[in-house]
Each structure stands twice: as structure tokens, then as C-alpha cells.
């Protein structure tokens, strides 16, 4: 039997976890590279108190790729709602914090938890230490902190990380170089995706890598990040931060969003991401448009199995 094709996926937040739940059932070798810029909620508290990278996004990805009894996954994802010190904490975050203490660093903690949860694939933090995400707004102000940036309410000019000199894991560089397909997204453009690519050497290696680079565009705009952005605007922001055009293919949703769901999102200043196929093609992009969303409790999500199948099809080209 031949070696399974290798896929490297960059992201964070809910979008990445949703995609991985479908992709893990395909005959591919998955590595998820996950942001360590989160500073809100349980992750932010553990990051500040224990001086470890934020575990929340990593926890969600481990759960998505796990192959354990549903009750074990539920236990790992359980969030406490009582107790002064425990309220708001996820048990999985606490376990990752404890494992970091036991193993000596965050990367080895993630590696060991991957074994415990029988993870299909690999999960790598973008760096083995916390980073701080900053955004320079179009009004000139610099806002610091991943959770603070969307609250400022101005258009983002650029984002950057401190410390500037932070090393990616050698394993991450190897994964990028050996990948048959590199997937970027879905996820928050400025606070989940770019914090990965801005880690020194990671962006450079992605640009140089021979693998096809696929951007899975968000279905809806995000208040405080991508208000009024088109699909082309998302790609332009990625290119601007990387210093060149590096995306080969973009996956966009062609399905009309039901009016009642649109109205709900509009109440939160979010709307469907528009796309102009000719504009995207003029940027040198291969455009794949399909009905790639599902709805649950009036929340829009990428259809994990449909998107996974489309990505596997790209490996056959």
C-alpha cells in the first residue's frame, strides 16, 4: 500500500476543528499547525498564570482529531460553570497545562496528549512559546492582544507578532516542506490564520513549498476583522502580509444563505462574503465554488465532509 498524501493545515478556532472532523476520515496524513496567540478566556488565564502557550485552540483540534469514546471527548471538552477558580476553565485546558508541567514544555505535552486521545494525524503548535498579536489600525493606533483586536471596531491595516524572534518547531518546517497540499483556513483571518504564517520562517517555507496552497474562504464576514471584505480582500490581506501572491486555489461557498439566518448574522454586523470569480481569476487563482455549508441552530458552518472530499479531489489532480 502506497504512502498516504500529506496535508498541512493552518488555522485555529472553530473553523479548523470543523474541517478536521471530516478530513480525519479520509486516506490522508494530516498535520494541523495551530496558533498560539490566543489570550482570552480560560486559555488567557492559564497563559498568564502559568506562563505557558494558550491551550484552547490546541485542545479543540486534539478533540476534533481524536478517536476515542464520545464520553472521553466530552470529558476533555467539559467546561466548569461553578467554583471561583474553576469557572470558565475547560478540563482539557487544565490537563494540557498539567501535561506541560510534567513533560517540561508545551510541544511535548501536545505530543503526549495526542497519544492519550488516539489522535489521527499530528497537532503542532505554531511555536513552543506564547506570542502576542498586535494590530495596526487604519487610524494609526496599535491594539495588542488577540481577544482585544476585534473589539476596537476599526479596519485593520496589518497585524504583527512579538517577540519578533521566535522559532517555529523544526517539525513544522519539515511538515511544510514534505506536504502534498497546504490548506489555509477556515478561521478568523487576522486572529487565527495570520498569527501562524507570521511566525518567522513558517511564512517563508509556505511560500517556497512546492505543494499547492488552498485558501478556504470564510462564509461570513467577521465584525472587527473583515467587515465588508470580499473573498478577494481576504486573499489580498494574506498576500500583503506574506509579501507576495502565494495562494493557488480558493474555495468559496456558492450557496445562498437563507434570509432568516442572514438577518441573525446582520444583527451582529456580519454578512455573507461576496466573491467575484473574474476578479479572483485575474489574481491568478483557481476558483472552486460549491455548496459547502451546513446549518445548525441558525449557525453557519463549513460542511466538514463536503469540504474534505473537495480537498482530497485536489490531491488527485
Curated annotation (Swiss-Prot):
The keyword Cytoplasm appears for this protein: yes
GO biological process: regulation of cell shape
Listed InterPro entries: CofD, CofD-like_dom_sf, Gluconeogen_factor
Cellular component, GO annotation: cytoplasm
Disrupted gene: phenotype observed: Deletion leads to growth defects when cells are grown on minimal medium containing ribose, gluconate, citrate, fumarate or succinate, but does not affect growth and morphology on minimal medium containing glycolytic substrates such as glucose, sucrose or glycerol. Mutants exhibit media-dependent filamentous or L-shape-like aberrant morphologies.
Subcellular location: Cytoplasm
Keyword Translocase: no
Pfam families: CofD
Subcellular location, principal: cytoplasm
Highest taxon of source: Bacteria
Keywords assigned by UniProt, alphabetized: Cytoplasm
Family to which this protein belongs: Belongs to the gluconeogenesis factor family.
Function, in words: Required for morphogenesis under gluconeogenic growth conditions. Required, in gluconeogenic growth conditions, for the correct localization of PBP1 and hence for displaying a normal rod shape.
Further remarks about this protein from its record: When bacteria are grown on a gluconeogenic carbon source, overproduction can restore a normal rod-shaped morphology in a mreB mutant by rescuing the PBP1 localization.
Descriptive protein name: Gluconeogenesis factor
Protein species of origin: Bacillus subtilis (strain 168)
Organism lineage string: Bacteria, Bacillati, Bacillota, Bacilli, Bacillales
